[in-house]
Amino acid sequence: MIYQSPTIQVELLEDNIAKLCFNAPGSVNKFDRETLASLDAALDSIKQDSNIKALVLTSSKDTFIVGADITEFLGLFAQDDAVLLSWVEQANAVFNKLEDLPFPTASAIKGFALGGGCETILTTDFRIADTTAKIGLPETKLGIIPGFGGTVRLPRVIGADNALEWITTGKDQRAEDALKVGAVDAVVAPQALEAAAIQMLKDAVAEKLDWQARRNRKLSALTLPKLEAMMSFTTAKGMVFAVAGKHYPAPMAAVSVIEQASTKGRAEALQIEHQAFIKLAKTDVAKALIGIFLNDQFVKGKAKKAGKLAKEVNNAAVLGAGIMGGGIAYQSASKGTPIVMKDIAQPALDLGLNEAAKLLSAQVARGRSTPEKMAKVLNNITPSLDYAAIKHSDVVVEAVVEHPKIKAQVLAEVEGYVSEDAIIASNTSTISINLLAKSMKKPERFCGMHFFNPVHKMPLVEVIRGEHSSEETIASVVAYASKMGKTPIVVNDCPGFFVNRVLFPYFAGFNGLLAEGGDFAAIDKVMEKQFGWPMGPAYLLDVVGLDTGHHAQAVMAEGFPDRMGKSGTDAIDVMFENKRLGQKNGKGFYVYSVDSRGKPKKDVDPTSYGLLKDAFGELKAFEADDIIARTMIPMIIETVRCLEEGIVASPAEADMGLVYGLGFPPFRGGVFRYLDTMGVANFVALADKYAHLGGLYQVTDAMRTLAANNGSYYQA
């Protein structure tokens, strides 16, 4: 053994080829500080052994290296610039040491080689991948750029245009696609991987392959004609900005770094990367996006733990077909859990099956599935008009019409047809789980399971704990949601649960602006372009449906009369009373038509302006800051109330609920990350300026205490 540490082992194979194996104690290899230090020490040991003629990098795991240890980032990035620069330079010195070894090197890549893992393989002269490999630099998704030489080496290996696409999108690349652009030199079967890499090194040692020419290309400036380079980078800037926009600076920074570094040798090029990396690491956007990644890991970790308490779900059922039932059936069946779709009407079953078939056909059309897989998934969906079909179901999801009496009746009926230990969940967005539980003989096996529409696109599922729900019930539904490919958060029962409870104060703020003459299209523009929502409040209400919004608003007003009670007619009432229901009937705040691709197209409608003018008078202009404050303050305070009341368990789960359930702008990180970035004291001062508008604008005592103590919701 040439070198051994808890994360890396180096041994000498036949023909004096050394093998460096990444072998961290956990399930995957990461580039944490310990691994970087071990790699540095391992390379020193390798350099001192004069017998070594070549080096192959391998992994003992199913994956190569998944990237840097992101749990270290927030603490590290909070350091002074000088400390951060020192860390980046030390890390890059290790990668340079690997690249500069006096003999040929190769990487044997299986599974993921992402971020720092990808940057590792770029330092070697040859790269062999097996068919499971996925390679990429996802750093821009975290608000930063590659920091271990990725922006320098990748363009010199695969060309500037390909590197720009890889780095600015942050997407993983399959082995076959990596081969096409020259990121890897060969793709082989998994069992042949190490042997293929070793054979390539033998050929290099025997001078059949010119490894030094390959290395020199990476150490030198890019060989791009000046005019071609200018055209490439100008085009890239336009395309990247069109996608990333002003709120996500990292992709544009990556283009700029690659452009500036293209005429430099390795040392100067790396310095350009270092400076850009440090600048981005200090941004609020990086903090927010890294926070989302960590929160996502936290929420999924909780779901994984729940799996240990969960009852195994081998068969499921959904009651109520149609679009929602079909979406739930598709999601369950496509992830491997057979499901019965039960309804009282054949047309509804047909609609549900058509919805599943439509979603599957789209997967086939995009090359993400095959007709054979589509047929298998459809065979996993059993439509039925008879309750007898659900008797073997481990979990039954009730998804009938949103009416408490109908749901209660269906839930009571279901208990008579399923086994004693079957779990029953209601897909409701507004009806109290405790209320529905009263219709059941065994309320301990009942909880809420709130899917968001469209089911196949929205990642969040709210699992609602009623006062009688058992831990096994909650754990089982959480595990089932995870198995369906969803991100579940557990919330306690209250009107609106978590997501709708915090959404409707936002709509109340919007209604307040319109009642004073606000222009809904101008408000939408501010909330989309400046705050960063995917759609503004008027457009969102049209998509949700103004009938749904009207009903949910009434539920919230009844549940929280002090803050959400209404004293008169608001804009939602005006639209609803004039049968303007939004996209579903072609007219709401906006009017809708179908574009050439068959997608809904919205236009401003003078009729809706006329109705609002009749109700609230002439239009009045509001400043953008005023619009943001009046819509967001109520949502933020209500989110904090949910945490304080224990409706949601942690800031992390609340923020993921907002990002995954409502599309809260990821670059802001969620309400609690936004509060920490803004400063709780600054928010309290802002809210106090609007406190005269009512209870929705009045901060809690706990918020005032936190502000006075200069506290924060996250610890890093």
Curated annotation (Swiss-Prot):
| Site, as annotated: Important for catalytic activity | 119, 139
According to UniProt, this protein's pathway is: Lipid metabolism; fatty acid beta-oxidation
EC numbers, comma separated: 4.2.1.17, 5.1.2.3, 5.3.3.8, 1.1.1.35
Instruction: Name the catalysed reactions.
Output: a (3S)-3-hydroxyacyl-CoA + NAD(+) = a 3-oxoacyl-CoA + NADH + H(+); a (3S)-3-hydroxyacyl-CoA = a (2E)-enoyl-CoA + H2O; a 4-saturated-(3S)-3-hydroxyacyl-CoA = a (3E)-enoyl-CoA + H2O; (3S)-3-hydroxybutanoyl-CoA = (3R)-3-hydroxybutanoyl-CoA
Ranges for the region named Enoyl-CoA hydratase/isomerase are 1-189
Write out the catalytic residues in the record: 450
Q: Where does substrate bind?
A: 296, 500, 660
Q: Which residues bind NAD(+)?
A: 324, 343, 400-402, 407, 429, 453
Q: Where is this region: 3-hydroxyacyl-CoA dehydrogenase?
A: 311-716
Q: Which residues form a coiled coil?
A: none
For this entry, list what GO says about its biological process: fatty acid beta-oxidation
Keyword Isomerase appears in the UniProt entry? yes
Q: Which GO terms describe its cellular component?
A: fatty acid beta-oxidation multienzyme complex
Q: Which GO terms describe its molecular function?
A: 3-hydroxybutyryl-CoA epimerase activity; delta(3)-delta(2)-enoyl-CoA isomerase activity; enoyl-CoA hydratase activity; long-chain-3-hydroxyacyl-CoA dehydrogenase activity; NAD+ binding
Against HAMAP family, the record matches this protein to:
FadB
Briefly state the protein's biological role: Involved in the aerobic and anaerobic degradation of long-chain fatty acids via beta-oxidation cycle. Catalyzes the formation of 3-oxoacyl-CoA from enoyl-CoA via L-3-hydroxyacyl-CoA. It can also use D-3-hydroxyacyl-CoA and cis-3-enoyl-CoA as substrate.
* Family recorded in the similarity comment: In the N-terminal section; belongs to the enoyl-CoA hydratase/isomerase family. In the C-terminal section; belongs to the 3-hydroxyacyl-CoA dehydrogenase family.
Q: What is this protein called?
A: Fatty acid oxidation complex subunit alpha
